[in-house]
């Protein structure tokens, strides 16, 4: 059976502001199944942003588990991410899930990979998904050479990724914490 896949999620942190955005395309094989999916959300009393890429059902399963870990650890993003990663590595069912998450709060941005790794991105910029490399390169160039806000950088990076990646569209959802 073919998998749902393809998306672009990008996060930019600059000073005390962070933005996290994603496109809206859901693809099954070579068919666009949905163009307006919401892959970026606010959770934990709107204090944490999360974006997901990969298999849609897998991503929702991980999102639910991550939200439970945040509740258990009173919103401590790093602790919740590490605990989710531990479960992801040891639980036989979770190990089969094919998804990645970017999470951000007022002070921290983390990438949680399908291997159960928790990564703190260099320079406050990270991206995942099929268009992630395009978006990350664009975000880095914009951050290094302009005074744009994190939201503006995320928006422009997603636009560039949407122009280059066939699994990424121009329907964007962007959330910020300031």
Curated annotation (Swiss-Prot):
EC code(s) of this entry: 3.4.25.2
Cellular component GO terms held in the UniProt record: HslUV protease complex; proteasome core complex
Substrates-to-products reaction catalysed: ATP-dependent cleavage of peptide bonds with broad specificity
Keyword entries, A-Z: Allosteric enzyme, Cytoplasm, Hydrolase, Metal-binding, Protease, Sodium, Threonine protease
Record-annotated active site: 7
GO terms classed as biological process: proteolysis involved in protein catabolic process
Gene Ontology molecular function terms on file: metal ion binding; threonine-type endopeptidase activity
Cellular localisation: Cytoplasm
Pfam families cross-referenced by the UniProt entry: Proteasome
UniProt: Na(+) binding residues: 162, 165, 168
Keyword Ribosomal protein appears in the UniProt entry: no
Regulation of this protein's activity per its record: Allosterically activated by HslU binding.
UniProt record similarity statement: Belongs to the peptidase T1B family. HslV subfamily.
Function: Protease subunit of a proteasome-like degradation complex believed to be a general protein degrading machinery.
PANTHER family on file: ATP-DEPENDENT PROTEASE SUBUNIT HSLV, METALLOPROTEASE TLDD
Subunit structure: A double ring-shaped homohexamer of HslV is capped on each side by a ring-shaped HslU homohexamer. The assembly of the HslU/HslV complex is dependent on binding of ATP.
Protein name from the UniProt record: ATP-dependent protease subunit HslV
Organism: Paraburkholderia phymatum (strain DSM 17167 / CIP 108236 / LMG 21445 / STM815) (Burkholderia phymatum)
Gene: hslV
């Amino acid at each position: 059976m073919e998998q749902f896949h393809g998306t672009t999620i990008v996060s930019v942190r600059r000073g005390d502001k962070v933005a996290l955005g994603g496109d809206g395309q859901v693809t099954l094989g070579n068919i666009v199944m949905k163009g307006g999916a919401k892959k970026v959300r606010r959770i934990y009393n709107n204090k944490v942003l999360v974006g997901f890429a990969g298999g849609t059902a897998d991503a929702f399963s991980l999102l639910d588990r991550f939200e439970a870990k945040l509740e258990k650890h009173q919103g401590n993003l790093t602790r919740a991410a590490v605990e989710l990663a531990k479960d992801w590595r040891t639980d036989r069912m979770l190990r089969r899930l094919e998804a990645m998450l970017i999470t951000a709060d007022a002070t921290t941005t983390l990438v949680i990979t399908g291997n159960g790794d928790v990564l703190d991105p260099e320079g406050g910029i990270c991206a995942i998904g099929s268009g992630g490399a395009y978006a990350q390169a664009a975000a880095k160039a914009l951050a290094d050479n302009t005074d744009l806000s994190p939201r503006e950088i995320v928006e422009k990076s997603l636009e560039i990724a949407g122009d280059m990646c066939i699994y990424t569209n121009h329907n964007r959802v962007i959330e910020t914490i300031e």
